[in-house]
């Protein structure tokens, strides 16, 4: 049976690194306070001239090089982002132009921190149903530093900028994407921006009810894992690696504890990258592969939750 297979991964981190001590010069906080509550030590920040599409293109080129394919072989480009260059056109079409990719159709997916999970699910469906798609390029890219309130210590310490990408192809065999699940609940308005094009004519800044986000994140991420296991007749011990959205170490630890899953089998990059929203999971996936943690044949579960609320999972055999 043909499955969507992740052929390669890529990532890009802006050169500028902002430490907790440097943030303490901006708002009333300190390194110990941030580490204890979030697990974050530093975050990467885009240069003034860098755009989300630039980060996306760099991650894409990294993935394309590893895949050893021609850009002209790519038939689909999906960019998951909350921070596009412009309201229109889509970030994906800008990326397509910068890559000089002539044979793809492209569009954005906006599901906040769950964006990459949503984008992979869409790509999985499209690559199976469209014969013209030989390879799909799926990117999560964010410049979250542009939509945080740098006077709000409860949110500005949490986020960073980055991009991660994967090349997906349809392939016969046991490896590949096994299942996905997506959920949303528009009634849970606990993470949002205080503006938007049609309401305030600007993008606004991030607002968050931290306590409620923690509660919902732990409950829904745990439920998403349990749903995936049930649908595939698996037990938690069958999972080789868990890659959760890199939002906060406390959320990750609470989910792992509820699942009775060994923390040693969890990919954690939140200390180095902070919360990079839709880029979080592809960035962590690329890191885990480059560090030879994830190996061929491993069963890997990706889980995420974001504003909306949106949440979901992707189960794959690498």
UniProtKB/Swiss-Prot annotation:
It catalyses: malonyl-[ACP] + acetyl-CoA + H(+) = 3-oxobutanoyl-[ACP] + CO2 + CoA. Pathway: Lipid metabolism; fatty acid biosynthesis. InterPro entries: ACP_syn_III_C (IPR013747), ACP_syn_III_N (IPR013751), FabH (IPR004655), Thiolase-like (IPR016039). GO terms for molecular function: 3-oxoacyl-[acyl-carrier-protein] synthase activity; beta-ketoacyl-acyl-carrier-protein synthase III activity. It is found in: Cytoplasm. Residues 246-250 are annotated as: ACP-binding. The keyword Cytoplasm applies. GO terms for biological process: fatty acid biosynthetic process; secondary metabolite biosynthetic process. It is an enzyme of class 2 (transferase). The active site is at residues 113, 245, 275. Catalyzes the condensation reaction of fatty acid synthesis by the addition to an acyl acceptor of two carbons from malonyl-ACP. Catalyzes the first condensation reaction which initiates fatty acid synthesis and may therefore play a role in governing the total rate of fatty acid production. Possesses both acetoacetyl-ACP synthase and acetyl transacylase activities. Its substrate specificity determines the biosynthesis of branched-chain and/or straight-chain of fatty acids. PANTHER family: 3-OXOACYL-[ACYL-CARRIER-PROTEIN] SYNTHASE 3 (PTHR34069), BETA-KETOACYL-[ACYL-CARRIER-PROTEIN] SYNTHASE III (PTHR34069:SF2). NCBIfam families: fabH (TIGR00747), PRK09352.1 (NF006829). Homodimer. The last Arg residue of the ACP-binding site is essential for the weak association between ACP/AcpP and FabH. This is Beta-ketoacyl-[acyl-carrier-protein] synthase III. It comes from Wolbachia pipientis subsp. Culex pipiens (strain wPip). The lineage of its organism: Bacteria, Pseudomonadati, Pseudomonadota, Alphaproteobacteria, Rickettsiales. The gene is fabH.
């Amino acid at each position: 049976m043909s499955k969507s297979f992740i052929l390669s991964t890529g990532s890009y981190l802006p050169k500028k690194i902002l430490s907790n001590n440097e943030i303490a010069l901006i708002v009333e906080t300190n390194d110990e306070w941030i580490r204890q509550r979030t697990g974050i030590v530093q975050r990467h920040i885009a240069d003034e001239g860098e755009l989300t599409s630039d980060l996306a293109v760099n991650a894409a080129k990294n993935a394309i090089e590893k895949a050893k394919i021609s850009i002209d072989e790519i038939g689909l480009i999906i960019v998951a982002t909350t921070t596009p260059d412009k309201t229109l056109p889509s970030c994906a079409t800008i990326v397509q132009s910068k890559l000089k990719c002539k044979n793809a159709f492209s569009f954005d997916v906006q599901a906040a921190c769950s964006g990459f999970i949503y984008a992979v699910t869409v790509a999985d469906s499209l690559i199976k149903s469209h014969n013209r798609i030989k390879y799909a390029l799926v990117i999560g890219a964010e410049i979250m530093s542009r939509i945080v309130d740098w006077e709000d210590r409860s949110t500005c310490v949490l986020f960073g900028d980055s991009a991660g990408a994967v090349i997906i192809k349809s392939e016969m065999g046991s490896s590949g994407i096994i299942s996905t699940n997506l959920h949303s609940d528009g009634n849970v308005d606990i993470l949002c921006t205080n503006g938007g094009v049609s309401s305030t004519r600007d993008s606004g800044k991030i607002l968050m009810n931290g306590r409620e986000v923690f509660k919902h994140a732990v409950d829904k991420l745990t439920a998403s894992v349990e749903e995936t296991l049930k649908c595939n007749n698996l037990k938690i011990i069958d999972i080789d690696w868990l890659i959760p959205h890199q939002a906060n170490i406390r959320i990750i630890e609470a989910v792992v504890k509820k699942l009775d899953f060994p923390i040693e089998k969890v990919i954690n990059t939140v200390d180095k990258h902070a919360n990079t929203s839709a880029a979080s999971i592809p960035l962590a996936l690329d890191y885990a592969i480059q560090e030879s943690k994830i190996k061929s044949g491993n069963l890997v579960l990706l889980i995420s939750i974001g504003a909306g609320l949106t949440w979901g999972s992707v189960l794959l055999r690498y």
